[in-house]
């Protein structure tokens, strides 16, 4: 998707397992999966594909999209997901996050996707009145250890990440921030690394060949 728009989609392959095989061959040790159908509708359509990936490669997988209640979380954990990302529900039902963290600890992460500093929900189709910084601090109070922060205006555009807001979240919350959206070059990765990001999610830049995953891993992955 470009900037989260479901009417601007590029499909890079019809077989997620084959795609992940290439990532693993390049040295990937953690896979980020988003159920875009689930994010939009609140129903996990791609459970079987996620399970096939986990069963095939036996490496940690984090996944989000359509996680709206405890049953959704339990289903993901039961098929072997290492980290479940709660997005929309963190705004609409923050008590779910609090309850989930009590049960599953650091297996729970929160996805904060923002436009102009305000959190977007429901597959990025609704803009809330909650700021990214405020939600991040609230989630930290609930015991969340990891937040995936996406600047929607950057996502899929290959124009570089939002370093300023990512740094603000790191500095003001003190929790692990994984940067997402717009990362395209080694210079982008150096900037994200320099501000103290816990990690980074790269998608389109790999699919389109702007970044070589093996080179990225060799240079930046912490042992």
Where are these regions (language model features)?
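Charged helix-capping and loop-helix junction motifs
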Residues: 44-51, 94, 125-134, 159-168
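Catalytic cores of alpha/beta
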Residues: 57, 61-83, 164-199
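Conserved, mostly hydrophobic/aromatic
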Residues: 23, 31, 76, 110, ...
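Hydrophobic faces of well-ordered beta-strands that scaffold small-molecule active sites
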Residues: 31-33, 61-65, 84-86, 108-112, ...
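Glycine/small-residue-rich loop that forms an oxyanion/phosphate-binding "nest" at active or ligand-binding sites
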Residues: 37, 45-102
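Glycine-rich phosphate-binding active-site loops on the catalytic face of alpha/beta enzymes
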Residues: 38, 67, 78-96, 151-153, ...
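Glycine-rich, proline-tolerant flexible connector loops at the mouths of alpha/beta enzymes
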Residues: 30-48, 88, 148-159
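Conserved anion-binding
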Residues: 2-8, 74-77, 81-155
């Amino acid at each position: 998707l470009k900037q989260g728009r479901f009417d601007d989609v590029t499909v890079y392959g019809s077989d997620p397992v084959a795609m992940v095989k290439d990532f693993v061959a390049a040295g990937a040790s953690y896979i980020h999966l988003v159920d875009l159908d689930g994010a939009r509708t609140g129903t996990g359509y791609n459970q079987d594909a996620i399970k096939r990936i986990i069963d095939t490669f036996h490496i940690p997988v984090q996944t989000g999209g359509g996680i709206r209640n405890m049953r959704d979380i339990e289903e993901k954990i039961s098929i072997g997901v290492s980290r479940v990302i709660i997005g929309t529900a963190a705004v609409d039902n923050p008590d779910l996050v609090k309850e989930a963290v009590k049960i599953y600890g650091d297996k729970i992460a929160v996805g904060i996707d923002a436009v102009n500093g305000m959190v977007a929900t429901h597959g990025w189709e609704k803009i809330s009145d909650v700021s990214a910084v405020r939600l991040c601090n609230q989630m930290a109070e609930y015991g969340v250890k990891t937040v995936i922060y996406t600047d929607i205006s950057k996502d899929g555009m290959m124009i570089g990440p939002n370093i300023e807001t990512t740094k603000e979240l790191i500095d003001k919350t003190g929790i692990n921030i994984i940067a997402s959206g717009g990362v395209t070059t080694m210079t982008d990765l150096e900037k994200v690394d320099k501000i103290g990001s816990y990690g980074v999610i790269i998608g389109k830049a790999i699919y389109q060949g702007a970044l070589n995953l093996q080179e990225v891993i060799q240079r930046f992955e912490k042992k």
